[in-house]
Every structure is written in C-alpha cells, then in structure tokens.
C-alpha cells in the first residue's frame, strides 16, 4: 500500500519505520509520469508497503481487529511518514492538492482464508481511518490474486482450493469499489491474468477475457499457464511477483483511472 499526494517527489528516512524500502522496480515511476501527463500536477509518493501482510496488519493498532504477530504497527508507520511528508512540503512552500492512496494488497488474505465480509469490514476501517487522520479523499484498489496454476501446499488445502480463496477476496474488492464513491478500481491487470489449477480452469466456474483463442474459446491449460507466467518473475522461480514491465503497466492504468475519476 502506498499513499500519493500532489507535489514534487522527495526522499526522506524515518526512525522506527518497519515498512519496506523501494528498490526501484515498482509501479510508482510510471504512475507519476502518467498522472502528471493526464493532470498536469506533479506528484509526491510516500511508499508504505510491506510484503506478505493481511489487511488486518494495516489497521490502526488500537483497533480490536488489528492482528500482527510482530507488532510492526504498519498503520502508524504509514501515517507518520505521510505527516512528515506534508510537513516537509509545507516548509518548502509547495501547495498540496489532492491526497490519495493506492492499495495493492490481498494475496496474504487469500492465503489465510480471510472471509469476504471480514475483508470488506477491515479494509473499510483502514480507509475511513486514513480519511480521518490524513485528510485523504480517495483511494484506488489494484485487484490482486495469487500464484497462477496453484492448487495448494498440501492435500489439506484441496478442499478449499486457492481459486475459491482468490474469488472471495476479489468479491470483497469489487464490493468496496461498487459501494464506495471514494474508492475506485485502479487496475485489474493482476487479477485478469490469474488462472487457477487445471481442474478449476477447465470448469465453467472460471471465466477469462485474456486466455482465449481466435474463436473466443479458452486456450488449452498448458498454453494459458505459460502466458500467465509471462507477467511474473517465473524464470527466477518467483511465481507471484510481477515483472517490471507488468508493474509499469499497472502504474499506468492506476494513474489513468485516478485522473479520470475527478
């Protein structure tokens, strides 16, 4: 999850932050370029990501639903960095326009079987807290999925396959977008390119608009899976993280959709 505000980009390190640092391979550079192109407004980004976290870990620490075994206090890290950014920009004389956030989160909730209703409830609390504490006016969701072709880690997973878990989180994210006028679809790139295990792929339950032949029929599973792996770092045995080109496309889509939403 990262937050965005209009203004110049800057870099600053904050004490006790447990958030990840940027390694440059992410959606942010293309987002900034495209958002500026579409709106004429410069952008400052506060990166507030931490991989492998369920939505419960991003809740304010005083929330009864907050759950983080390592007590990283991610919400407080996010808001501390954000407020410091505002202070820095104010001091430099920049006029701050829209305050927005972009959220690319959900894979871990797929893994731990977070129910649709609980995800909606917790995401809404994070969203409302960011609005209240930081004055953010709108958020964009990057819809997520899980490892393409993955059925489960063991036979105990097969009764509740990852395909069903992905659908549960997708329904939650779609519901949040549909039922809140201040939450939009940033990008469905990741979800659109996800495919489940072969059995679920070949069933009528799975629909795709990506893995189709010239007649509009589903591709054979092996061909579809090979295509799905083009957008992740599969050659390096990384089947869940997007390639840099895929992340650029996601950043581009989020910027276009946010710009159109005003």
What is each model feature region?
Residues 1-262:
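Cell-envelope and extracellular/periplasmic
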């Amino acid at each position: 999850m990262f937050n965005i505000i209009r203004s110049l980009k800057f870099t600053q390190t904050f004490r006790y932050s447990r958030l990840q640092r940027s390694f440059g391979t992410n959606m942010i550079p293309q987002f900034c370029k495209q958002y500026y192109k579409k709106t004429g407004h410069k952008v400052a980004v506060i990166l507030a990501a931490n991989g492998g976290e369920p939505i419960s870990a991003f809740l304010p620490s005083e929330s009864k639903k907050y759950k983080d075994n390592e007590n990283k206090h991610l919400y407080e890290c996010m808001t501390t960095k954000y407020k410091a950014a505002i202070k820095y920009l104010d001091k430099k004389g920049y006029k701050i326009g829209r305050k927005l956030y972009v959220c690319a989160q959900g894979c871990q909730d797929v893994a731990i079987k977070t129910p649709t209703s609980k995800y909606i409830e917790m995401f809404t609390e994070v969203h409302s807290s960011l609005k209240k504490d930081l004055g953010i006016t709108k958020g964009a969701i990057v819809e997520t999925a899980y490892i393409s072709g993955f059925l489960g880690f063991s036979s105990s997973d097969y009764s509740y396959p990852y395909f069903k878990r992905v659908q549960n989180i997708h329904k939650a994210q779609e519901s949040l977008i549909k039922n809140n006028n201040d939450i939009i679809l940033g990008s469905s790139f990741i979800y659109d390119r996800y495919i489940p295990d072969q059995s679920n792929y070949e069933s009528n339950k799975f629909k795709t608009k990506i893995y189709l032949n010239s007649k509009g029929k589903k591709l054979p599973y092996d061909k579809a899976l090979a295509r799905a792996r083009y957008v992740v770092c599969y050659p390096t045995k990384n089947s869940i993280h997007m390639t840099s080109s895929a992340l650029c496309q996601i950043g581009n889509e989020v910027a276009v959709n946010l710009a159109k939403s005003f």
